[in-house]
């Protein structure tokens, strides 16, 4: 998506504190308090990216409160794209991420915390990535 739009891509996982990464490596779920500094960092970066050309941020943003914090850092509305899928498929994809610290076993705890957004564009990840990217681009063109 980012390469097609010619803007930077960021993975929110890259902004976690080392202590949180260690917890996840051990299979320990993060709590809201663990995510506070991570959300602050992402919010500050969103403001910087907004003043540049924009960016694509891949971020779990599991709860509405997290999304509210992230939106608060920018002047314009965030274009929210919610990618959803079955736990089994997500675990399979997580297991295929070589060298990533997040254990597929933690997916269940994320599903337990998940508050799906009632807004934005929703896509099932069982669709091809090409289809999802094309659909998002079509929606972006019709939003301007």
PLM features per residue range, with description:
Residues 33-75, 83:
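Glycine-rich phosphate-binding loop used to anchor ATP phosphates in small-molecule kinases
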Residues 16, 61-63, 85-89:
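Conserved nucleotide-binding/hydrolysis micro-motifs of P-loop NTPases
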Residues 96-137:
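Small-molecule kinase domains that catalyze NTP-dependent phosphoryl transfer to phosphate-bearing small molecules
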Residues 67-71, 92-95, 136:
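Short amphipathic alpha-helical segments
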Residues 9-14, 78-80, 120-122:
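Conserved beta-strand scaffold positions in the cores of enzyme catalytic domains, especially
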Residues 138-144:
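Generic C-terminal helix-cap and adjacent flexible tail
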Residues 2-44:
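Conserved substrate/cofactor phosphate-moiety recognition/catalytic segment
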Residues 74-93:
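Conserved phosphate-donor/acceptor-positioning beta-strand/loop module used by diverse small-molecule
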């Amino acid at each position: 998506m980012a390469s097609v739009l010619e803007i930077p891509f960021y993975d929110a996982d890259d902004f976690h504190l080392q202590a949180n990464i260690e917890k996840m490596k051990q299979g320990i779920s993060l709590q809201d308090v663990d995510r506070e500094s991570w959300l602050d960092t992402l919010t500050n970066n969103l403001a910087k990216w907004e003043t540049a050309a924009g960016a694509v941020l891949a971020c779990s943003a599991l709860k509405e409160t997290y999304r509210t914090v992230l939106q608060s850092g920018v002047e314009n509305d965030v274009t929210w794209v919610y990618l959803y899928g079955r736990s089994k498929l997500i675990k399979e994809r997580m297991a295929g991420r070589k060298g990533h610290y997040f254990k597929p076993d933690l997916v269940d705890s994320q599903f337990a915390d998940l508050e799906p957004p009632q807004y934005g564009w929703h896509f099932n990840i069982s669709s091809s990535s090409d289809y999802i990217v094309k659909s998002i681009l079509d929606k972006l063109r019709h939003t301007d």
